């Protein structure tokens, strides 16, 4: 399909310049046939460079990394730690915040980090606004409160996955299991397993809902493979899990445990 589209684009461009190309070809043939071969080769190289510049510019325009999650998951403190390296008291936000993040990968790359409110009345509205520009989504989970919030987390994540799969260029997705400094925090492995179970139940419920009542009716009918228990590995987009702690193991004065998150951001930049 891609080669056919390329041929159509090339045919259209060639048609527009055909009289000029014919005239140039005749003049070159009269002077020296070798010049014709050189001119054709140069033209092919030029068109290739223009094509790849267009493709790269589209990719480069997707520089946003969206931080999403339930209220009190710690995503705003993660956002602040990445940008400043410092601890700061945060409160539940009602507006989005964005800032340029310099990626530490020795290539001078940067990303735009966008912290989206976790309040239920705002989260989907703002996600819709920014998702088309997202290179990646960081879904932050409160590992200490996960056991009692698992259903709410799964419902939010379900919609994030559905929205991401519906995009032409699906973003990378990271599940950041935050607050690992708390003794009762669940591991990333356990969180992944429980989310797979909850999402498996959710997709059955959503697929059985009447289309007129299902807000995601224009998206794929279900996640994963039909007839099989849901696993993140079945999705067309890559989903990764890691453990982190925005607060750190020594309280407010300690350094954050976000090295794995920083490495992941450098990888997708």
Curated annotation (Swiss-Prot):
Sequence positions that bind GTP: 69-77, 90-93, 118, 178-181, 246
Keywords assigned: Endoplasmic reticulum, GTP-binding, Membrane, Nucleotide-binding, Phosphoprotein, Receptor, Transmembrane, Transmembrane helix
Keyword Endoplasmic reticulum: yes
Residue list for modification Phosphoserine: 110
Name of this chain's protein: Signal recognition particle receptor subunit beta
Subcellular localization(s) per the UniProt record: Endoplasmic reticulum membrane
CDD domains named in the record: SR_beta
Keyword Transmembrane part of the UniProt annotation: yes
InterPro entries to which the protein is assigned, alphabetical: P-loop_NTPase, Small_GTPase_ARF, SRP_receptor_beta_su
Biological process terms in GO annotation: SRP-dependent cotranslational protein targeting to membrane, signal sequence recognition
UniProt membrane topology term: Single-pass membrane protein
Gene3D superfamilies: P-loop containing nucleotide triphosphate hydrolases
């Amino acid at each position: 399909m891609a080669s056919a589209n390329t041929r159509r684009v090339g045919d259209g461009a060639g048609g527009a310049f055909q009289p000029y190309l014919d005239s140039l070809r005749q003049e070159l043939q009269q002077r020296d046939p070798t010049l014709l071969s050189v001119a054709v080769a140069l033209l092919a190289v030029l068109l290739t460079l223009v094509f790849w510049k267009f493709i790269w510019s589209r990719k480069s325009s997707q520089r946003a990394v969206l931080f999403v999650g339930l209220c009190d998951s710690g995503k705003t403190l993660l956002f602040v730690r990445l940008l400043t390296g410092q601890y700061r008291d945060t409160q539940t936000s009602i507006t989005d915040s964005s800032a340029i993040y310099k990626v530490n990968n020795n290539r001078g790359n940067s990303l735009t980090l966008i912290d989206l409110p976790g309040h239920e009345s705002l989260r989907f509205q703002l996600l819709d606004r920014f998702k088309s520009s997202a290179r990646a989504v960081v879904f932050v989970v409160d590992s200490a409160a996960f056991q009692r919030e698992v259903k709410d987390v799964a419902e939010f994540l379900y919609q994030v996955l559905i929205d991401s799969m519906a995009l032409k260029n699906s973003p990378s997705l990271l599940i950041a299991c935050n607050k690992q400094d708390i003794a009762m925090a669940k591991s990333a492995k356990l969180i992944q397993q429980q989310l797979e179970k909850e999402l498996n139940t959710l997709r059955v419920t959503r697929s059985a809902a009447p289309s007129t009542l299902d807000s995601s009716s224009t998206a794929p009918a279900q996640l994963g493979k039909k007839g099989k228990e849901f696993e993140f590995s079945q999705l067309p987009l890559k989903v990764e899990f890691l453990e982190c702690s925005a607060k750190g193991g020594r309280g407010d004065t300690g350094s954050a445990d976000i090295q794995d998150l920083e490495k992941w951001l450098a990888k997708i930049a």
